[in-house]
Amino acid sequence: MERIMLKSKIHRATITGADLEYEGSITIDRDLMDAADIVSYEKVAVWDVTNGSRLETYAIEGERGSGVICLNGAAARLVAPKDVVIIASFVNMSNQAAIKHEPKLVFVDGKNRMLPTRAEEAGQARVRCVH
């Protein structure tokens, strides 16, 4: 059996542009792509935290160190500059490999600069639920 697992994500990146006239894709700062192990033309999911939209596209390389996160083509209609997004990539792997798998998590600040690596917190760990 194979499972589809989160390979990596860039968490809470800020959209820097939306170019409707470009042919498609999402332009991502090359440093962020490297940190998240995303290569050019790799399929990625983009989840807009600001407005709830979700889409799939492919990544293309942006200028290293620029902080660029720009949705291109039709997807540009689903986001706006300053929206906060999560960019995720996935991988197929065996059940045995999935049990040991650790995704690469890249956390960024409001200018898309990398923050120190840390473990991801479950949502319930951040908010106390009252029954």
From Swiss-Prot:
Gene3D superfamilies: 2.40.40.20. The active site is at 25 (schiff-base intermediate with substrate), 58 (proton donor). Heterooctamer of four alpha and four beta subunits. Disulfide bonds: none annotated. It comes from Pelobacter propionicus (strain DSM 2379 / NBRC 103807 / OttBd1). It comes from the Bacteria. Catalyzes the pyruvoyl-dependent decarboxylation of aspartate to produce beta-alanine. The gene is panD. HAMAP family: PanD (MF_00446). This is Aspartate 1-decarboxylase. Its cofactor is pyruvate. GO terms for biological process: alanine biosynthetic process; pantothenate biosynthetic process. GO terms for cellular component: cytosol. It catalyses: L-aspartate + H(+) = beta-alanine + CO2. Substrate binds at residues 57, 73-75. It is found in: Cytoplasm. Its main location: cytoplasm. Binds 1 pyruvoyl group covalently per subunit. Is synthesized initially as an inactive proenzyme, which is activated by self-cleavage at a specific serine bond to produce a beta-subunit with a hydroxyl group at its C-terminus and an alpha-subunit with a pyruvoyl group at its N-terminus. Pfam families: Asp_decarbox. Keywords: Autocatalytic cleavage, Cytoplasm, Decarboxylase, Lyase, Pantothenate biosynthesis, Pyruvate, Schiff base, Zymogen. Belongs to the PanD family. Its EC number is 4.1.1.11. InterPro entries: Asp_de-COase-like_dom_sf, Asp_decarbox. Pathway: Cofactor biosynthesis; (R)-pantothenate biosynthesis; beta-alanine from L-aspartate: step 1/1. It is an enzyme of class 4 (lyase). PANTHER family: ASPARTATE 1-DECARBOXYLASE.
